[in-house]
């Protein structure tokens, strides 16, 4: 497995209970991200307090990237967080996702220049569980953002 300095970008908006579970799972990775950036689309003070609490519990830098709440602008705040990221490899998740302990390791293991990795969630229901594996897309050679 080739090692990359990995930045984990977590987008959130006013749901600190879910973000806490996401942060807990982020800090329990078998391959830790080099940094965590919380892309906050205008949450209230509870989110900032939660992030401050988690900063005190880990040596992994946690960066809170916040923008004023002027409506749904998650794309804008993700872009701002990515601009602040220092990793060569960026993993982006929503703040209501609980990461499998090998989530970062699995991403890094299939990462290559010019490759975009996507996947879906494990959906847990009262009578069923579904899972989709990560997929690597090789066609992102001339991506323009």
Model feature map: region roles:
Residues 23-24, 48, 87, 101-112:
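Short alpha-helix within the catalytic core of nucleotide-sugar-dependent glycosyltransferases
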Residues 68-85:
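Glycine-rich, basic loop-to-helix element that forms the pyrophosphate-binding segment
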Residues 90:
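Short aromatic/hydrophobic "clamp" motif used to bind/position activated sugar donors
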Residues 102-134:
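Conserved donor NDP-sugar-binding/catalytic core segment of glycosyltransferases
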Residues 94-98:
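The conserved acidic donor/metal-binding loop of glycosyltransferases
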Residues 1-25:
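N-proximal low-complexity "stem/linker" segments adjacent to membrane-targeting elements
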Residues 25-66:
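Acidic donor-binding segment of Leloir-type glycosyltransferases
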Residues 133, 140-145:
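Single conserved hydrophobic/aromatic residue that forms the stacking wall/gate
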């Amino acid at each position: 497995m080739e090692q990359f300095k990995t930045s984990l970008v977590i987008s959130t908006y006013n749901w600190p209970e879910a973000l806490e579970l996401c942060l807990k799972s982020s800090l329990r990775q078998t391959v830790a991200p080099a940094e965590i950036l919380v892309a906050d689309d205008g949450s209230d003070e509870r989110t900032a307090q939660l992030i401050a609490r988690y900063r005190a519990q880990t040596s992994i830098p946690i960066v809170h990237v916040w923008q004023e709440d002027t409506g749904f602008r998650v794309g804008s705040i993700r872009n701002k967080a990515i601009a602040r990221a220092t990793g060569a490899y960026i993993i982006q998740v929503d703040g209501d996702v609980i990461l499998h302990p090998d989530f970062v390791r699995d991403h890094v293991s299939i990462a290559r220049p010019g490759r975009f990795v996507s996947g879906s969630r494990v959906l847990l229901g009262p009578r069923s569980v579904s899972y989709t594996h990560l997929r690597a897309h090789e066609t992102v050679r001339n991506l323009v953002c």
